[in-house]
From Swiss-Prot:
NCBIfam families the record matches: miaA
Coiled coil segments of this chain: none
Organism: Prochlorococcus marinus (strain MIT 9211)
Pfam families membership: IPPT
Protein name: tRNA dimethylallyltransferase
Amino acid sequence: MSSSKPLIIVLLGPTASGKTALGIEIAEHLGLEIHNVDSRQVYMDMDIGTAKPSQEQQKRIRHFLIDLKPPNEKMTMHDFHKTARVSLDNALNKTNVGLLVGGSGLYLKALTSGLCPPSIPPESSFRKQLHDIGQEQCYQLLQSCDPLSAKTIAPSDSVRTTRALEVFYATGQSKTSLQSSKPPPWRLLELGLNPSNLNDRIAQRTENIFQNGLIEETEHLIGKFGKELPLLNTIGYAEASQMIDGKLPLNDAIFQTNKRTKQFAKRQKTWFRGQHNPKWLNEKNPLSEALSLIHNVIR
């Protein structure tokens, strides 16, 4: 493969694995900027609960693809893909090397494979109807009207089932067939972090976000956007919201957030094993190994 092709370095791993810190070190050594791939960090006003790179970290290295929209405006995969490609192309024009850092597997896969999702906006009333029907019947419906997409979706995956049905009823076509796929013109080096003490790191991260102002951040979001904001149902914010309502004491909120985060990390690792093929870095000295692998590819 021609070394003149641009190189995209992907640093992936489950939540709390240390991607942000290592990504910054790699960027500093190579003179790069970071393109964040996190489905919640694209939203403004959501810093603590999403473990967004701090202001100090952003001063050290410029980060792109964060704070793109207010949390009451949906960032679709199509929107993200389009914005990310422009951002990456700008970086590649300057250095011929781009650095992606994140744990949102579906976003990473779409971006690195060149798969562009259809630009069909979500339709709340239709989604409510599907929710009322229930996932089992929704999946059977999908198998009937769009068997091609159904084969790629787990029967329990209500989010992707709903989206596939939404696209089909809006266009009359399969979501799978509507997705345009054009392999991007770059080389790809995927590096992975999966520390053996991940559960301890998650527990510490959970303690930190509550101590550092998650409750206050959640109160701000409720005051600005209302209790019905969908993102308030995500990990951490949901527990903080229940605590604010007096439905959950602090210790239970921390416990539930920790539990849900570990479950999420497990799903992330399953995705990375099935959809990506990263070189898993030695946890004792990941920076040294990462730089060695990168220099071998660049040469």
